[in-house]
Every structure is written in structure tokens, then in C-alpha cells.
UniProtKB/Swiss-Prot annotation:
Entry function: Implicated in immunoproteasome assembly and required for efficient antigen processing. The PA28 activator complex enhances the generation of class I binding peptides by altering the cleavage pattern of the proteasome.
Chain intervals for the UniProt region annotation (Disordered): 65-86
This protein's name: Proteasome activator complex subunit 2
Residue numbers carrying N-acetylalanine: 2
One example GO MF annotation: endopeptidase activator activity
Keyword Acetylation in record: yes
Keyword Magnesium recorded: no
Assembly behavior: Heterodimer of PSME1 and PSME2, which forms a hexameric ring.
Gene Ontology biological process terms in this record: regulation of G1/S transition of mitotic cell cycle; regulation of proteasomal protein catabolic process
């Protein structure tokens, strides 16, 4: 006779798992009913701030303390003068763009928060998926669709983190080139172009973050009954 298969846990381990599940469900409930609406309102207010409504992008430019070298000598100068090499003036400490850094200080935590909340929702729904068996699986299909969408949001948020890291890398390269090739003005212009471009990226990120939270609220609240009770069983709460 075949032995029944299953995971056997000690009484203490089962208790700890149950505590984890209860805490998870409470976090999910708080996220849906309190955190989500408050976060949508906050991001909406943030988008009304002057710092996210700059019309003159030139005002975002940070000063580049990179000395401009003297023009090259004329052809008719004496040969002895040409042989006298002048050292290229060196630049000192080059800070980042303070205005952009201030915006990043606001946006980066929001990106991290949404990523963590997506993980929370994914874990919560995964713990609500019932035992796989014959019967009415319509609710399970809804759970899977919601999971698919939340994972898609998480992937897009992770792309925001890549965009932010890429900004520092590309701006750093542009500053390095501008400080090395001090006579090439295009490298200086490239630094300003990166600052202006990332400003648009950061505003778009906040717009997307607000939209993602609104989407999560809609898709979860609209399908909450099937998410928490996929088999149509009687349950007193959202878990």
C-alpha cells in the first residue's frame, strides 16, 4: 500500500507558518484598504509640486566647473613658441546636479516601495490558491490573471531602477569626457542633455507609479471575492 505523500511539520513549525500567514493577510488587507488610496492621493499631490512641473528645462542645468583652455596658437607664431607646451587646466571636484538629485531622493523610495508591495500582493495571492483538483477553477484562473498583471507591474518598476542607474553611468561618462576633452563643447552640452532627459523620465515614473497603484486597486478590489474565495466557499473575511 502506497504511503500518503505530504509535508510533515512539527507543531511549533506549523504554528510559526500560521503566524506568518496571518501577518501576511493582515498586511495585504492594510495595503488594499488604507495604503493604496493614500498612496494614490500622495502621488497625485506630488505631481502638482513645482519641482515636477518645470517648463524651462534650461533651469535644470548644473554649473560645470571645467576650465576652458586657451585657443591653439596661430600658424605664423615662431617655432620656439610652438615648442612651449601649455598644460591643460585641471578641473576640481565636480558634484552632481543638485536639482536632479533632490528629485531622485523623492522618486527612488517610491520605486522601491511599489516593488515591495508587488511582492506582498504576489505572496498573498499565492497563499490563497487552493489545492489543485477537479471542479470549479474559474476563481483560480482569476487569481492567475491578477498575478500575471502584478508581475508585469513589478517588471516595469524594476526597469525604473535600471533607468536611474543608467542616468548616473551615462552622466558620469559625459562629465569625464567633458573634463578630459575640455575644448569639445559638445561633451558639456551632453551633460546638460542627460539632466534634462532624466527630468522627463522621473516625472513619467511618478505618473506611472500613480497609474500602477490605481490599477492594482481596481484589479484587486474588482476581483476580491474570487481572489480570496476562488472555490466559492464561505469565508468570513478577505482571508
Amino acid at each position: 500500500m502506497a504511503k500518503p505523500c505530504g509535508v510533515r511539520l512539527s507543531g511549533e513549525a506549523l504554528k510559526q507558518v500560521d503566524v506568518f500567514r496571518q501577518n501576511l493577510f493582515q498586511e495585504a488587507e492594510e495595503f488594499l484598504y488604507r495604503f493604496l488610496p493614500q498612496k494614490i492621493i500622495y502621488l497625485n499631490q506630488l505631481l502638482q509640486e513645482d519641482s515636477f512641473n518645470v517648463t524651462d528645462l534650461n533651469s535644470l542645468r548644473a554649473p560645470l566647473d571645467i576650465p576652458i583652455p586657451d585657443p591653439p596658437p596661430k600658424d605664423d607664431e615662431m617655432e620656439t613658441d610652438k615648442q612651449e607646451k601649455k598644460e591643460v587646466p585641471k578641473c576640481g571636484f565636480l558634484p552632481g546636479n543638485e536639482k536632479v538629485l533632490a528629485l531622485l531622493a523623492l522618486v527612488k523610495p517610491e520605486v522601491w516601495t511599489l516593488k515591495e508591495k508587488c511582492i506582498l500582493v504576489i505572496t498573498w495571492i499565492q497563499h490563497l490558491i487552493p489545492k489543485i483538483e477537479d471542479g470549479n477553477d474559474f476563481g483560480v484562473a482569476i487569481q492567475e490573471k491578477v498575478l500575471e498583471r502584478v508581475n508585469a507591474v513589478k517588471t516595469k518598476v524594476e526597469a525604473f531602477q535600471t533607468t536611474i542607474s543608467k542616468y548616473f553611468s551615462e552622466r558620469g561618462d559625459a562629465v569625464a569626457k567633458a573634463s578630459k576633452e575640455t575644448h569639445v563643447m559638445d561633451y558639456r552640452a551632453l551633460v546638460h542633455e542627460r539632466d534634462e532627459a532624466v527630468y522627463g523620465d522621473l516625472r513619467a515614473m511618478v505618473l506611472d507609479l500613480r497609474a500602477f497603484y490605481a490599477e492594482l486597486y481596481h484589479i484587486i478590489s474588482s476581483n476580491l471575492e474570487k481572489i480570496v474565495n476562488p472555490k466559492g466557499e464561505e469565508k468570513p473575511s478577505m482571508y
